[in-house]
């Protein structure tokens, strides 16, 4: 069976290309966020799974919830998704759209898991170093986890760098078991 990532990809790509050409990627990002939130609502998700409703009635119901907050092109996009019975992939379309947007803008979200709260200066220094290393503008988000004991774990996309004391102790324990 085909997964949501595969189903969403052509829609996300088309949406991103359209939004980029129209200089509206931020607006489309917001509209996709709104639409994704709507279809993720339990009541709407149940409605979309109802086999007795036609595709057109599902589109009408979904659009009724946010039609005033989106432009005509976006309403057409939603209608196209509905016509192909793909409204349920909107959250995945949004995720992929954001990935395309981040790639185009050369930005990346980075999670910094630390044992204690970093100062603004430390966070800024770390973000600058990561920005240089990753060749992207970094959007750091700090997560405090005292279980790390010290150091930090950096997560940026597929990259994970564990420089924590807990990580080093785990590596040492593994090497001693060998």
Swiss-Prot record:
Keyword Cell membrane annotated: yes
Which keywords appear in this protein's UniProt record, sorted alphabetically?
ATP synthesis, Cell inner membrane, Cell membrane, CF(1), Hydrogen ion transport, Ion transport, Membrane, Transport
Say which domain of life the source belongs to.
Bacteria
One GO CC term, this protein: proton-transporting ATP synthase complex
List localization entries. Cell inner membrane
**Membrane topology category:** Peripheral membrane protein
Molecular functions (GO terms)? proton-transporting ATP synthase activity, rotational mechanism
Tell me the protein family, please.
Answer: Belongs to the ATPase delta chain family.
What functional role does this protein have?
F(1)F(0) ATP synthase produces ATP from ADP in the presence of a proton or sodium gradient. F-type ATPases consist of two structural domains, F(1) containing the extramembraneous catalytic core and F(0) containing the membrane proton channel, linked together by a central stalk and a peripheral stalk. During catalysis, ATP synthesis in the catalytic domain of F(1) is coupled via a rotary mechanism of the central stalk subunits to proton translocation. This protein is part of the stalk that links CF(0) to CF(1). It either transmits conformational changes from CF(0) to CF(1) or is implicated in proton conduction.
| UniProt subunit comment | F-type ATPases have 2 components, F(1) - the catalytic core - and F(0) - the membrane proton channel. F(1) has five subunits: alpha(3), beta(3), gamma(1), delta(1), epsilon(1). F(0) has three main subunits: a(1), b(2) and c(10-14). The alpha and beta chains form an alternating ring which encloses part of the gamma chain. F(1) is attached to F(0) by a central stalk formed by the gamma and epsilon chains, while a peripheral stalk is formed by the delta and b chains.
This one is known as ATP synthase subunit delta
* Upper taxonomic lineage: Bacteria, Pseudomonadati, Pseudomonadota, Gammaproteobacteria, Pseudomonadales
